Amino acid sequence: MANLHEIIQWCDQTLKAAEFKDYAPNGLQIEGSTEVKRILCAVTASEDAIDAAIAQNADLLLVHHGYFWKGEPYPITGMRGNRIKKLIQNNISLVAYHLPLDAHPSLGNNIAIAEKLNLQNLEPLDLTEKHPIGNIGYLEQALSVDDFKAKLQNSFDFKVIHLPAEKKTIQKVGFCTGGAQDFIAKAALQNCDAYISGEVSERTFYEAKELGVHYFACGHHATERYGVQRLAQAISQQFTVESEYFELNNPI
């Protein structure tokens, strides 16, 4: 058993959450039990994840995508109201870390991608960022475009969308998990052969072709499964709590 606020303090410090300008609050979003025995982690605080937390008697739901995003309406009604009501009624805390959990050098989503693809000699995708959200890495050997796509599909268990460019082989790879397709321009500035993110926009087709960078959409959910699991495991090691991951196979 551990104290909720001690867990939050440790996470905030470990992830340097206060140093990020984000689109939603990082850390404790909804306060439930101050005593934590069990954590359920998930990519998104969906109703399915909340129901799983209730069924598993979790005291804390740890997610990458929480609530209270910039631009959302203030009233807590409808779908979001129903989710929050369930959390409060069941005394479950909601804890969310967004950009800090993308960027962390050992717990983050992006480092997990680099490790899965065995990308070496990592560099920031954007040299101006204090805590780089995206990165660049190098394959040990250049691969054909088809072989690289197959590697991605096997790694993420996802039907990868490929938007082609002219280059015949791929070795220098830019990547940023989630919905960072617009960072393809940053990858082009760094002379990447390919760029990986989660989602795709209509304009991305033209950008890949005209910028000369192969674009691969590997799934917003699929590329962001890893950070919450790593963070939950780290919490379990730091504190006397159990943790488990909830997977809902989101095709986006």
Briefly describe each language-model feature range.
Residues 1-252:
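Active-site catalytic microenvironments in core metabolic enzymes, especially phosphate/sugar-handling
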